[in-house]
């Protein structure tokens, strides 16, 4: 499975730098000089699954985004060709998590959600990150519900069984 760690927003200057929107919780590691990333996007002719590999030469912060210089991208035209492309990594390349009750987002997506009594609620489609904490977006038959990812509500997660068990407060699943 591929995970998106950044998106090229636009070129910057005339020397081939690109502005990258960060989509990872560890940009210092993912975008460190010497790191190899795969870029998927409009430059590849739309071929399904194709990607071009780049080595990061330099990186610096720029207003909440990164300015990245890639080996082989030497001018504005080459940088413009990358606009809209996504930098991806393989999920298998992520380090294992040693902390209990801590998960990568992609591990939770697709899990079945049920109540403590075994009643099916739906399927996790996304983990939404907010200033107040994480929410599980759970797709139900006719709608979607956002479940706060806190111990008081999410009582257990079993990656092996593919189940997230919740103890929702009264009304959480009935909100219109």
Swiss-Prot record:
Protein's cellular compartments: Cytoplasm
Domain of life (superkingdom): Bacteria
GO MF entry, a single one: ribosome binding
UniProt domain PRC barrel: residue ranges: 100-172
Cystine residue pairs: none
InterPro entries tied to this protein: PRC_barrel-like_sf, PRC_RimM, RimM, RimM_N, RimM_N_sf, Transl_B-barrel_sf
Pfam (any one): PRC_RimM
Location, primary (coarse class): cytoplasm
Keywords assigned by UniProt, alphabetized: Chaperone, Cytoplasm, Ribosome biogenesis, rRNA processing
GO biological process: maturation of SSU-rRNA
Keyword Cytoplasm included in the entry's annotation: yes
Entry GO CC: cytosol; ribosome
UniProt keyword Cytoplasm present: yes
UniProt domain comment: The PRC barrel domain binds ribosomal protein uS19.
Function field: An accessory protein needed during the final step in the assembly of 30S ribosomal subunit, possibly for assembly of the head region. Essential for efficient processing of 16S rRNA. May be needed both before and after RbfA during the maturation of 16S rRNA. It has affinity for free ribosomal 30S subunits but not for 70S ribosomes.
Quaternary structure and partners: Binds ribosomal protein uS19.
Sequence similarity: Belongs to the RimM family.
PANTHER family registered for this protein in UniProt: RIBOSOME MATURATION FACTOR RIMM
Alphabetized HAMAP family for the sequence: Ribosome_mat_RimM
Name of this protein: Ribosome maturation factor RimM
Naturally occurring in which organism (per UniProt): Mycobacterium tuberculosis (strain ATCC 25618 / H37Rv)
């Amino acid at each position: 499975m591929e995970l998106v760690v950044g998106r090229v927003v636009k070129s910057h200057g005339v020397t081939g730098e690109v502005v990258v929107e960060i989509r990872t919780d560890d940009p210092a590691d993912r975008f460190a000089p010497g790191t190899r990333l795969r870029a998927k996007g409009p430059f590849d002719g739309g071929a399904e699954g194709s990607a071009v590999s780049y080595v990061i030469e330099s990186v610096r912060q720029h207003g909440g985004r990164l300015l990245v210089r890639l080996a082989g991208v030497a001018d504005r035209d080459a940088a413009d060709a990358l606009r809209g492309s996504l930098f991806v990594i393989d999920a298998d390349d992520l380090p294992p998590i040693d902390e209990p009750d801590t998960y990568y987002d992609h591990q939770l997506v697709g899990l079945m959600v049920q109540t403590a009594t075994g009643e099916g609620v739906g399927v996790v489609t996304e983990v939404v990150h907010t200033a107040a904490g994480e929410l599980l977006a759970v797709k139900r038959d006719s709608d979607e519900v956002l479940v706060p990812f806190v111990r008081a509500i999410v009582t257990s997660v079993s990656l092996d069984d593919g189940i997230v068990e919740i103890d929702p407060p009264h009304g959480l699943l009935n909100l219109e």
